[in-house]
Amino acid sequence: MDIKQLLLSIILTVSVVNGRGRRINIYGAENGKSDIVQLRGPAEQLVYSSPIRERRPIFRNALLSNSPLRWSKMQDLDGNYLIPYVISGNYDTVERDTIKTAMEKIANNTCIRLIPRTNQPDYAEINNKKGQGCYASIGRFPGKNVVMLESNDDQSCIQEDTVIHELFHVIGLWHEHMRADRDAFINVLYKNIEPAQYPQFEKLSSRDATTYSVPYDYNSVMHYDENAFAKPGKISMMTKDSKFQKVIGHPKDASSNDYKKVCAIYHCSKCMHQDFQQIVEQEHIELNNPIITNAPVQQGDSCTDRLGICPMLKSREMLNCKVMATFCCSSCSAPTSTTTTTSGTPSDGSLWQRIKSIFQ
């Protein structure tokens, strides 16, 4: 093989590995307002005038193991939880293989199995639309659950770690830096962040957050990088342990702690090819959760919303109370005339118009 053939071979190999387009930074402005559907709404969805929150949304590091948002309706004969999916986007063979590899890694390390959809009413739809970036909703909502993985000659979400990250959102994981204990591990530099982006750095109280006592993990595939949503030339986060400053947000794969939290959500019998109960006992993972019933939460003659997005959905006329009453009791019970509306109604071409079918 002469030098020209060798160089051509290297170029072709790199092209196949990198796929189409440049990598989309899921933690930057180029990816829209967030890679989580519930955080992609207008900034007024959560009201912030400072790093101190003015009202408390119900966000968690990981879903409770008895959350109604788990994919718990279907199991196979081995007790694995099934998430039906369809790939409706246009992807090439290499990209489809990358998506399938990400699914296989999750299956090999947890009790979650992503299976091709037949006629199941609740499912994940993996789609590819130019200009949409990478995003997914947290947990299972009725009907279609969008997993947007844009890929074209300009830019792409199809890297194994990014696909795993978005699938973990669907399964039930939020971002690592949102944990209640994050201040012991990182400093969020609010002076370097536009106020409209403060919701991306919401810290949860220990009463709200569920970490299952799994240690904070700089290597998590769910961790933001140091520049996430920062002003140009600035960083938004500084790690307390300096050797991890350039590590956060740059994983090549899910960490063992990521898999442990998924296993905790679904009470898997096996986790990373080990008996999960042994892992629980050895690492003191906490599986006990507050009881969540399937009925609306009643307080006297009133009831409360169990999802922080309920008021926003109602104000946008996107709240379908036939299917969401269990989660949005207060918003569904309140007269429409008393609902606080938000200025700046989205146009027909806005993101919320495009994704509102998720909630209907």
UniProtKB/Swiss-Prot annotation:
Gene3D superfamilies xrefs: Collagenase (Catalytic Domain) (3.40.390.10)
Requisite cofactors: Zn(2+)
Pfam families: Astacin (PF01400)
Biological processes, Gene Ontology terms: nematode pharyngeal pumping; nematode pharynx development; proteolysis
Location(s), subcellular: Secreted
Domain PLAC: 299-336
Keywords attached to this entry: Disulfide bond, Glycoprotein, Hydrolase, Metal-binding, Metalloprotease, Protease, Secreted, Signal, Zinc, Zymogen
Biological role: Metalloprotease.
Name of the featured protein: Zinc metalloproteinase nas-5
Species of provenance: Caenorhabditis elegans
